[in-house]
Amino acid sequence: MAPQKDRKPKRSTWRFNLDLTHPVEDGIFDSGNFEQFLREKVKVNGKTGNLGNVVHIERFKNKITVVSEKQFSKRYLKYLTKKYLKKNNLRDWLRVVASDKETYELRYFQISQDEDESESED
């Protein structure tokens, strides 16, 4: 007889957060425009613009929360965020970093001044 597998109860909702604090405060990122982009681009059952009552996208100051009643991948949210950054030519300055299990954060790339100076001397 095969050993029984422990079955995890299925999650009823998926909740993910995007922290946009630093770029929004610096004025290079528009959270309202990004929220609209997500509403247009998120696919439900293979169709865009089909959020219905299944996926809810909420913006509170500098944070965007995506709540889904169907399975929703955190990786898909990262993909859409990177797509938005590329579309608005922000991909060279910002990166998407997971700060915890349910949260992504937009951070600036860390460029050290020492590397730039040593390259210019050569």
From Swiss-Prot:
Name one matching Pfam family. Answer: Ribosomal_L22e
Name it.
Answer: Ribosomal protein eL22-like
Instruction: State the gene name recorded for this protein.
Output: RPL22L1
Q: Does the keyword Magnesium apply?
A: no
Spell out the Gene3D superfamilies in the cross-references: 3.30.1360.210
Transport keyword on record: no
**Family membership:** Belongs to the eukaryotic ribosomal protein eL22 family.
Q: Which residues carry this modification: Phosphoserine?
A: 112, 118, 120
| Molecular function in Gene Ontology | RNA binding; structural constituent of ribosome
GO cellular-component terms in the record? ribonucleoprotein complex; ribosome
Query: In Gene Ontology terms, what is a biological process of this protein?
Result: cytoplasmic translation
The record's InterPro entries line, in alphabetical order, gives: Ribosomal_eL22, Ribosomal_eL22_sf
